[in-house]
Amino acid sequence: VLEIPAMELIMPVYLGASDAHLAAGAAVLGNTSAPIGGDNTNCVIAGHRGWRGADYFRHIDRLAVGDSVTLTNLWGTLTYTVADIQIIQPHEVEKIKIQPNRDLLTLLTCHPYASGGRQRYVVYCEKLPTMSQSR
């Protein structure tokens, strides 16, 4: 489950970005990290920017650096902080690859809104080490 307070959003997250999964919520893109966190991971979660009356990632532009994003899986809840926001071209797949020594959650949607997907709006969220992990 993905929770983004700044967007007033709570939505399910499915494994695999099939049409059915994206119609029902957000989905982890194939060939990206599983939604379990850890060093050298980047879990990329895609969502429609509005779909058949549901907002989904419609208001992703409300997010700002420093905002909190949580992802709950079967083992617990991971809390991330928005670290960067970029607008990229659809072919720039290197921008969503794993970055060494970082634990990332990347949110991905079409941009601009209702444009048919000419570009991608990308929100990079990083899980910062807790005090016990940084010692």
Regions flagged by a language model, labelled:
Residues 1-135:
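Solvent-exposed, non-transmembrane regions of membrane-associated and secreted proteins
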